């Protein structure tokens, strides 16, 4: 049940990443308002997802009798701090149409970095970390 909730949030994040990609392809100038709306919606989904992991997932896995599970969980927690900073910087820099339009090239570069980082993290969580939920 817990795993399904996290995967549902992952799909929502990936859907928003794809939505932003399409908007960028359609033209930043004409899509800036929609881009900022998508970024702000994604920020909300990510904040809820991270809060749930912090409150439920990580404590569960850190209680595991398996030292490997505890070590991997700690590593994921540390990595999340770095990813959260990358995403927060992106969201703060591009959460309005005017910010996006004032630095279109920077927006595209930052979005590509964020998209890659989020997809990489989601893939790793689903193929490794979430498999430990039933073993914890």
PLM features: residue spans?
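Small-residue-biased structural context
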Residues: 1-136
């Amino acid at each position: 049940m817990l795993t399904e909730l996290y995967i549902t949030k992952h799909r929502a994040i990936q859907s928003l990443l794809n939505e932003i990609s399409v908007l960028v392809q359609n033209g930043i100038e004409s899509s800036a308002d929609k881009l900022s709306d998508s970024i702000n919606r994604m920020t909300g989904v990510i904040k809820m997802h991270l809060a749930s992991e912090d409150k439920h997932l990580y404590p569960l896995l850190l209680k595991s009798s398996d030292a490997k599970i505890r070590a991997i969980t700690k590593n994921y927690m540390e990595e999340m701090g770095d990813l959260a900073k990358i995403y927060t910087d992106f969201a703060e820099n591009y959460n309005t149409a005017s910010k996006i339009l004032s630095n279109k090239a920077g927006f595209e570069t930052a979005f590509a970095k964020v998209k890659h980082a989020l997809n990489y993290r989601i893939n790793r969580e689903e193929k490794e970390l979430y498999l430990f939920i039933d073993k914890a």
